[in-house]
Design a protein with these regions (language model features):
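Electrostatic, structured charged patches in enzyme active sites and in nucleic-acid/phosphate-binding
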Residues: 1-229
Length: 229
């Protein structure tokens, strides 16, 4: 898909989200820059999860209005929750995904009633060279989100430069290593692992090193730098 596919429509937030009594609404500071509005805790968790992945270029809330005809023959307008732009591994092309965030019990219960607007969203996305996906808890509140929330607390931990520099130097020099193998290479003494583990979590949280965030974080976790990943 071309990185220019967004040029076919004007992509911007078309609907502002106000306070709601039925769910939690607010704004999330995406990568410390733009504030992205959400209107449920599930939408907030979607933003937290996808902020971590470097291939996510941007997320636009309430991005487009899509006209559709309901089963009753009346005209309506549907606004998906987000437009997510992802960069392919080659770093050149960009993929765009229209996203609807919905709890599983709601979309299962209302699938037939909502099918007209979702079919319209798929048609609209296809015409733009995009795709349309529905995200429920199974795609958002997974192991990756648990790990991301666990690491978040370590972003603000003060680190001894000697620990982080030693770990980074080893990964730059040798390449991907498990956490246990990295500790062994750096001469970490048994019983003294705690500050070194905190340094690992800090480096992961601040994205100076990487791992497969979808897997459990433990001694077998493979770590690498962006240089040798």
């Amino acid at each position: 898909m071309s990185g220019n596919s967004c040029d076919k429509v004007q992509v911007r937030q078309v609907r502002k989200i106000g306070p709601t009594r039925r769910s939690v609404s607010g704004s999330y500071q995406f990568r410390g820059k733009e504030a992205i509005q959400y209107e449920s805790t599930l939408e907030r968790d979607f933003l937290i999860r996808h902020e971590f992945f470097p291939n996510i270029v941007s997320i636009t809330p309430q991005p487009v209005e899509i006209p559709f005809i309901g089963d009753n023959g009346r005209a309506y307008t549907y606004t998906p929750d987000f437009l997510m732009s992802l960069r392919y591994l080659d770093g050149e092309a960009t993929q765009h995904v229209l996203v609807e965030v919905k709890p599983r019990d709601l979309w299962v219960e209302n699938w037939r009633a909502w099918s007209s607007k979702w079919k319209a969203a798929r048609r609209f996305a296809r015409n733009q060279g995009w795709s349309f996906k529905i995200y429920d808890e199974s795609r958002i509140r997974d192991r990756a989100l648990e790990n991301i929330k666990f690491l978040d607390r370590y972003q603000r931990f003060a680190q001894a430069p000697g620990h982080t520099d030693t770990l980074l130097h080893a990964l730059y020099k040798i390449g991907p290593l498990s956490r246990d193998a990295l500790f062994a290479h750096c001469g970490v003494i048994a019983g003294d692992e705690r500050p070194w583990a905190v340094a690992i979590w800090y480096l992961l949280a601040t994205r100076r090193i990487d791992c497969d965030i979808t897997l459990q974080l433990d001694g077998s976790t493979i770590l690498w730098t962006h240089q040798n990943g």
